[in-house]
């Protein structure tokens, strides 16, 4: 990139590539900024990370972080909407990174201030338990972050009591699991990555004031009751929510 008349009223900034660069645009009043292979473009700025770039690293954690960072950069470059608010973008990047599905840009519904609110209560230690509908959703939550924040994750799907309750009441096991979870952890953060009947059960419990979730992540997937369950959870405006709309979702 290059800056003409830097610091003056006539200042102009141009971001370009070596292939498209026109030397005729540069004169004695121009400052030229040269990036490297790690430089990237974001919000009208050319950003080059500080430090020395290593082609290879033997640290497993470093390799994983490097892959994630490069993945996020790739995703951000391919987003159609370049003016997404930072809190929405943070959640969207993770959703696309997990699914490799850029339709998330259109179907990920985020309540106003939901990400900010959830981030705040998580970091303030106000969330002690996360409830998931299935074990796969529980397995996908980073263990290191949970340990650092002192948060426990519970899934009642494999609980014998849930199986017995499901048989007795004629409901699904995930539905029974959420019913049990609401009795023991009514104010938990509830995460759904598979079962629409479980999300519908939570909605029913909220209406009956038997559950008071501090937040809801609603991403059940499939063809039966999926869209209906997501429509049911939307009206609870007092609860911060992230919803993958339509049939898509997943743990």
Model-inferred region functions:
Residues 2, 130-132, 155, 191-192, ...:
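General beta-strand structural signal in soluble alpha/beta enzymes
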Residues 220-251:
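A structural signal for small-residue-enriched, beta-sheet-centric alpha/beta enzyme cores
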Residues 6-10, 37-40, 195-198, 221-224, ...:
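Short Gly/Pro-enriched loop/turn and capping motifs at secondary-structure junctions
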Residues 1-59:
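A contiguous loop/helix-start segment that scaffolds small-molecule binding in enzyme catalytic cores
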Residues 134-206, 213-215, 220-222, 226, ...:
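Conserved mixed alpha/beta catalytic, RNA-binding, or beta-rich assembly cores of soluble enzyme
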Residues 26-29, 125-128, 148-152, 184-188, ...:
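Short coil/turn connectors at secondary-structure junctions
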Residues 59-128:
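Electropositive, gly/pro-rich neighborhoods at or near active sites that engage anionic ligands
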């Amino acid at each position: 990139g290059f800056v003409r008349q830097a610091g003056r009223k006539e200042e102009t900034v141009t971001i370009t590539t070596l292939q498209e660069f026109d030397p005729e645009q540069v004169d004695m009043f121009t400052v030229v900024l040269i990036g490297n292979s790690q430089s990237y473009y974001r919000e009208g700025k050319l950003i080059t990370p500080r430090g020395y770039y290593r082609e290879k690293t033997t640290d497993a954690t470093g390799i994983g972080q490097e892959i994630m960072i490069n993945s996020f950069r790739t995703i951000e470059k391919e987003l159609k909407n370049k003016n997404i608010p930072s809190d929405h973008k943070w959640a969207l990047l993770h959703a696309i990174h997990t699914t490799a599905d850029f339709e998330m840009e259109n179907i990920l519904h985020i309540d106003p201030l939901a990400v900010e609110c959830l981030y705040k209560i998580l970091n303030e230690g106000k969330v002690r338990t996360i409830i998931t509908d299935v074990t796969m959703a529980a397995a996908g939550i980073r263990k290191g972050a949970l340990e650092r924040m002192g948060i426990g994750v519970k899934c009642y799907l494999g609980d014998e009591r849930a199986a017995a309750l499901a048989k007795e009441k004629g409901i699904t096991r995930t539905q029974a699991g959420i019913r049990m979870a609401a009795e023991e952890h009514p104010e938990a953060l509830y995460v759904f990555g598979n079962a629409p009947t479980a999300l519908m059960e939570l909605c029913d419990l909220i209406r009956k004031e038997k559950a008071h979730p501090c937040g809801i992540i609603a991403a059940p997937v499939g063809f039966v009751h999926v869209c209906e369950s997501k429509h049911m959870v939307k009206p609870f405006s007092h609860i911060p929510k992230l919803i993958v709309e339509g049939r898509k979702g997943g743990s």
